[in-house]
Each structure stands twice: as structure tokens, then as C-alpha cells.
């Protein structure tokens, strides 16, 4: 029997506000343990939360970017549970009336087709702290993350394969990043994914028993975990067994999902309205103000790169996959850089350098200005493409002007015949055996002189000019 896969995803995204959702403490990632905390984060008696307006701004932008309806009458709810990283013993979240609902996003699949994935809801909430279990028998609580603003985006169960889930996450990450509300860095926990997956016989409308997958710390692991679950559940069902409602984690080392716990039923969090935060209304004017702050999104930007700049669909997709790269490209082209040349450098040498160094574009010294200048001095013959690779590495590590560096480092290409011809004659004098081979008509003997000349000029001879002059001088040599 063949089965249809049904997948829904829950994605937590940390919003990039300066302070937390209900306290003025910094929401910055990477500080020392418990450095970003105050009495509200520790839930001292008598403290009251104060809503950060910037969080609601970000929530509105997310809802608009994901084609969602917006609940204009806003309130928060208490989600009650006890855990050491949650000192209040409840989380302030949204239950029955999330900020956004009934949305969708269009995703592009590997075969080039597109599919619209529904989004059930997006709600605002506070993050919990972090527990660390030490080898000394103690557990430690870091509340830096406690109160960091989150938006949880819950998809409809519209995905029918791990490939579609991967495509959905890719598209969602792009939209959130372009909207400017999160850096969506999974390695820093600012984007976290839980997956729900079930199988059912083709033609059956009722969903099968679902499994929840956790510990999915990359899009690749989401895909691998789901692929494993499809196989695991199908084998159980084909053998006559039943799927239990479980929470499982993906074990990257074993490339398998591991049981965490069996779910007996839905958790009862005893939601009720948060009494310490008043109701408020999101006005049409507020919504429109946030709409005006939204940028051009990846789909529209890709289309413009193809139609206006003449890039291929592939190049446009690669450039727009990351907003930082796309914005860099935009600025370089605005400065007069040739779109195709800038694209080639960003996807070629720049990407290779970043991968080798383990860095991002923001972490190196290359700027749109010095990249455009470097491309210009390649075009005008000041440097060769080969020398440009060395110049690029210097710019990436040290910054500064491309032309200034080339001149100071003595890398300017030699194009003057008055300089090159004497060097060619010296090459002939230094390589008598090669000259003899050439004069005797030995096949491909002339090719050796190209290498000799480039070595003599330390690679600085303009290849086009040098080859033309070399051919001219070789012809004279043959006549003598």
C-alpha cells in the first residue's frame, strides 16, 4: 500500500528588537549568562510587564508579508506550565486571537513548479530561558533569552513531501529576512523548527496519527528527519502496526529519529487572558504605516533582475536567496557596476572566500564601492583577472581602495609595447634552446614563450597585448 505524506511546520522566529517583549532589558544574543536580565525577567513579586511596541510593529509586518488577516483587537494570554527556565510558571503568549491568521506563501519546488502553502496563524509570545545540565550534577539556568520576543508561525498541513517542507522553510526565511524583522540565524536560535508528520492511504481525507519532530537545527536536518520518518512510519503501517502519537528528535550522528516521549493526549496549558496587559486595538493607519515600511520581496526582486538587468533565472535566485548579498549587489549596481560582473564575483570568488573563512559578507572588509572599483580596473586593463583575485583577497581582509592598493603594491599590468618588447627580446636571449626548437619548426614550440614572458613580468604583462607582441617578434625571429 502506498501512503500520502502530510506535513505541517511550526516555526519560532526571534524578532530583532533592541529590547525584550515585556521588559527594557537588551535582547542581544551572545552576552554572558544572565547579563541581559532584570526583575521582570526573574519574575520578582509585584513586577508588571510593559509591552514593547516594536514587537507589535514586527508582528504586523510579518502578517502582511505572509498575506495574513490581522486581528485588530489585540490581547495576550497566559500559557501555564512549570519549568526551571520559566520563573513565572507561565508564558505570556496569544491563544485564541493571534496577531495574524489565514495566510499563505508561495514556494518554488525543485522541478520549477510553484505551490501555495497555507499559514494557519502567527502569534506573538516571549521566549523561555535556557537550561544547561553540567557534569557536576547541577543544572544551570540562563535567563538572557527569557522574554526575547518571538513570533510563532504555524503552517497548515499542506506539505506533501520533505522537499516541499524544505522549500517552504527557504521561502519563509527569505520573506522574514527581507521584511527586516529577524536575522533568522538557526545557529543562534533565532529560527527554530518543529515538524508534525503523518501518513495516510491515498484518497483518505482523515489525517493519520502524527509524530512531532524536534532538534531540527538546520533546514537540511528538517529534510533528513522527515525523510526518515516517512520511511519509518510506512514500514510500521505496511507491517500491520499502528503509529503512536510521539515526540521524537532527529539524531544527526545516526541519521535517525529517536523517541523522546509518548504523548497520551493534548497538553492542558489552562490558557486565560493576561490580566496585567490591557486590551488594545491595531488601527488601519498603523497597519498601513507598517505596509509602507515593507521592502521589495525576493520574488519581485528576482523578476526585476531578469527583466531589467539581464541576469539568468539561476543567478537571480542565487543573489536574492540572502538579503545581505542582494542588498550588496543592489548597491554595487547603483554605483555603476556591471550587473553580470558583480553577480559573477559574488557567486564565485566572494562565495568561495566566505566559505573558506567561515564568515558572512558583513564580517569581511569588502564593500560595494571597492568591488566596483576593482571590476573597473580589470575592464580598463590596469590589472588582469588573475591579479584581480589577489587584489580581492586583500580588499576582503583589509578594505581600502582597489586602485590605490594595486599602484602601491606594484601590480599594475604592463601594456606598453616599449616596455614589453625589450623583455621579449631578453626572453629569447635567455632561452636559446627554445629559440632553436622554434626555428627548426618543432610543433608547439612557440607556446613555451608565453610562459617565459609571464614569468619574466611576474604575471603583470597584459595578456592580450603581450601575446600580440610576442607573435609579432616570433615572426621576425623566424625570418632571421
From Swiss-Prot:
One of its GO terms (biological process) is glutaminyl-tRNAGln biosynthesis via transamidation. It catalyses: L-glutamyl-tRNA(Gln) + L-glutamine + ATP + H2O = L-glutaminyl-tRNA(Gln) + L-glutamate + ADP + phosphate + H(+); L-aspartyl-tRNA(Asn) + L-glutamine + ATP + H2O = L-asparaginyl-tRNA(Asn) + L-glutamate + ADP + phosphate + 2 H(+). Its EC number is 6.3.5.-. Keywords: ATP-binding, Ligase, Nucleotide-binding, Protein biosynthesis. SMART domains: GatB_Yqey (SM00845). Disulfide bonds: none annotated. GO terms for molecular function: asparaginyl-tRNA synthase (glutamine-hydrolyzing) activity; ATP binding; glutaminyl-tRNA synthase (glutamine-hydrolyzing) activity. It comes from the Bacteria. PROSITE patterns: GATB. InterPro entries: Asn/Gln-tRNA_amidoTrfase_suB/E, Asn/Gln-tRNA_Trfase_suB/E_cat, Asn/Gln_amidotransferase, Asn/Gln_tRNA_amidoTrase-B-like, GatB, GatB_C_1, GatB_Yqey_C_2, Gln-tRNA_amidoTrfase_suB_CS. Belongs to the GatB/GatE family. GatB subfamily. Heterotrimer of A, B and C subunits. Allows the formation of correctly charged Asn-tRNA(Asn) or Gln-tRNA(Gln) through the transamidation of misacylated Asp-tRNA(Asn) or Glu-tRNA(Gln) in organisms which lack either or both of asparaginyl-tRNA or glutaminyl-tRNA synthetases. The reaction takes place in the presence of glutamine and ATP through an activated phospho-Asp-tRNA(Asn) or phospho-Glu-tRNA(Gln). This is Aspartyl/glutamyl-tRNA(Asn/Gln) amidotransferase subunit B. The lineage of its organism: Bacteria, Bacillati, Bacillota, Bacilli, Lactobacillales.
